[in-house]
Amino acid sequence: SEGVVVIPVYDEPATLTETLERLPAGLLTVLVINAPPGAEGRNAALFQALDVRPADGVFNVRHIAGPVLVVNRSTTPLPPRQGVGLARKIGADIALRLMADHVLPVTWIHSTDADVTLPPDYALAAPAVDDGVAALVYPFEHVAPNGLGDAMARYEIALHHYVLGLALAGSGYAHHTIG
């Protein structure tokens, strides 16, 4: 495998297929399908859109060129208020175990969101970084749906303002967070 990407997914069939189709073919994709308590049925359309079904003990997933690991945490819901963060951690823990067991010969775990629109030339390669660097945040831009441009601009300014404020204060945590 050329790498691994973890994608937490909840009730996002429309945008997820576009994201998956832009991932490199040699990439292991870990989909952690999750739902909060009481919303377990919300992923039915997602499973249908991906055409997730067992075949000889292995799941086939439409729209993904490379190997895929589907972790279904929607039938056993995640605890309240831990959804996307815990789903991302579950996927990263699985990838880390595969790396530690030398099943997955890569050095980086990438993560994105199911509702992200990736650029057409998107590639997840091991970045060239200085020793001691353990995490990177890729440049991002939020594209607002019609009528929400001002709200999205304020949201993105708030994200950057938070990080810049931490940097100005000399904090070692001056980086964007992910859910």
Question: Model-derived features: where do they sit?
Answer:
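Active-site-proximal specificity loops/subdomain of glycosyltransferases
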Residues: 40-106
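N-proximal low-complexity "stem/linker" segments adjacent to membrane-targeting elements
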Residues: 1-22, 35
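Short beta-strand-to-loop acidic/aromatic patch adjacent to the donor-nucleotide binding site
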Residues: 101-117
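Short acidic, S/G/P-rich loop/turn micro-motifs used as interaction or catalytic elements
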Residues: 11-15, 36-38, 77-78, 115-122, ...
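Short loop/turn segments at strand-loop or loop-helix junctions that form parts
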Residues: 7, 31-36, 70-76, 138-141
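Conserved catalytic core of nucleotide-sugar-dependent glycosyltransferases
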Residues: 101, 120-179
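Short, acidic, metal-binding catalytic loop of nucleotide-sugar glycosyltransferases
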Residues: 19-29, 35-38, 45-53
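Cell-envelope/extracellular polymer assembly enzymes that use nucleotide-activated donors
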Residues: 2-4, 28, 40
